[in-house]
């Protein structure tokens, strides 16, 4: 199976039908295709936003677009965000935090975190500028997030046999640089806000890495999910902010 199809199956719920007996590519080979999958998601979200905006009032359209966003990814990254809320915020040891994050039950921190996050996402979508600025935000958010998660995969892992280790195995920095192409394209469409989103998204990923190292001893798959969700939100907020151009 082509690595792009493996990435598409791993990151989305899109109905991909590989050939019979086709074996998925190793995750490390699929990883450089993550940003391109993000760009595809951004294109689908842009189309969904246009359709929903034409059919419904703005607030309802923003809520429905948030639901479409979650449906396209199967809630995979929201699950990581919820687990990180429970684990990273618990006043316990690093080992106990890792155990909490593997527990399928959702704690109070996860519930509160998910509610606040989804409210922020809905109102960030509602506040996006009309036209090209809003489309650029929807294209860049999932693309940048899935590029920065590759950088996280190259950092120390809290679980040697976890998702991060599978992603990092064989992943080289030249592949990481090549994977930036769709990110650069999407950022260019956003003008100065696109450039600002690159910087702020990278800062968010760095802060998440620092917290993961301090509280868990390294990165996990849940931390990567948290990174994707937070970078997407930061990107949307950057485009929604009422800041005059420089």
Task: Describe each PLM feature range.
Residues 1-74, 90, 95-98, 103-246:
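Hydrophobic alpha-helical transmembrane segments
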């Amino acid at each position: 199976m082509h690595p792009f199809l493996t990435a598409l199956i791993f990151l989305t719920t899109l109905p991909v039908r590989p050939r019979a007996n086709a074996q998925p590519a190793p995750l490390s080979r699929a990883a450089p295709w993550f940003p391109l999958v993000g760009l595809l998601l951004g294109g689908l979200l842009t189309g969904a936003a246009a359709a929903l905006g034409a059919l419904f009032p703005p607030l309802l359209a923003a809520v429905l677009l948030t639901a479409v966003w979650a449906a396209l990814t199967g809630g995979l990254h929201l699950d990581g965000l919820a687990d990180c809320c429970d684990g990273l915020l618990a006043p316990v040891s690093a080992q106990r935090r890792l155990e909490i994050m593997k527990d399928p039950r959702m704690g109070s921190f996860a519930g509160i975190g998910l509610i606040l996050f989804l409210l922020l996402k809905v109102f960030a979508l509602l506040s996006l500028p009309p036209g090209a600025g809003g489309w650029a935000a929807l294209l860049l958010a999932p693309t940048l997030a899935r590029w920065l998660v590759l950088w996280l995969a190259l950092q120390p892992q809290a679980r040697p046999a976890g998702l991060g280790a599978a992603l990092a195995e064989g992943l080289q920095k030249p592949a990481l640089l090549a994977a930036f192409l769709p990110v650069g394209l999407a950022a260019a469409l956003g003008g100065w806000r696109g450039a600002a989103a690159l910087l702020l998204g990278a800062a968010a990923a760095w802060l998440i890495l620092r917290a993961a190292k301090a509280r868990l001893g390294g990165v996990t798959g849940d931390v990567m999910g948290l990174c994707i969700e937070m970078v997407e939100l930061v990107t949307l907020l950057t485009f929604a902010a009422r800041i005059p151009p420089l």
